[in-house]
């Protein structure tokens, strides 16, 4: 277990902080500690709910890059819920949900590039506009 903890701290660039109390860490470091706690259990699927909300842009990108590295290097599935689309292009696949008739529905599943083509947009940020103005057009039944 000790080796697993050490490897996890190293993979998340937290080795230098291992003796620091959590309340003294930055927001980005606290998020990485949260990820580390889950990784130590060695799950196949890691669920991250709004893992980047409230972070500065640098820390947000770092969390996204760490998530991608974990998925690829450790052969894990990382499921991340986010409303922030700035670094979403780092994801391998996207699941886009929309609200139609007061119920959440699947609108799209695919790569970021496929998302742009499907919604006929030039930036992922535009997905919200499409779904807010024409939700029924994109709901998959």
Task: State the predicted function of each range.
Residues 42:
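Conserved catalytic motifs of ABC-family nucleotide-binding domains
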Residues 46-49:
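Catalytic Walker B motif of ABC-type/P-loop ATPase nucleotide-binding domains
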């Amino acid at each position: 277990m000790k080796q697993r903890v050490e490897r996890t701290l190293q993979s998340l660039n937290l080795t230098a902080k291992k003796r620091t109390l959590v309340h003294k860490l930055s927001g980005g470091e606290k998020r990485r500690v949260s990820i580390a706690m889950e990784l130590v259990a060695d799950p196949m699927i890691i669920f991250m709910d709004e893992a980047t909300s409230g972070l500065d842009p640098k820390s947000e990108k770092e969390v996204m890059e760490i998530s991608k590295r974990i998925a690829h290097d450790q052969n894990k599935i990382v499921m991340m819920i986010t409303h922030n689309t700035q670094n979403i292009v780092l994801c391998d696949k996207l699941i886009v949900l929309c609200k139609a008739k007061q119920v959440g529905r699947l609108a799209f599943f695919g790569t970021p590039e496929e998302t742009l083509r499907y919604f006929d947009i030039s930036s992922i940020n535009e997905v919200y506009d499409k779904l807010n103005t024409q939700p029924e057009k994109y709901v998959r039944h």
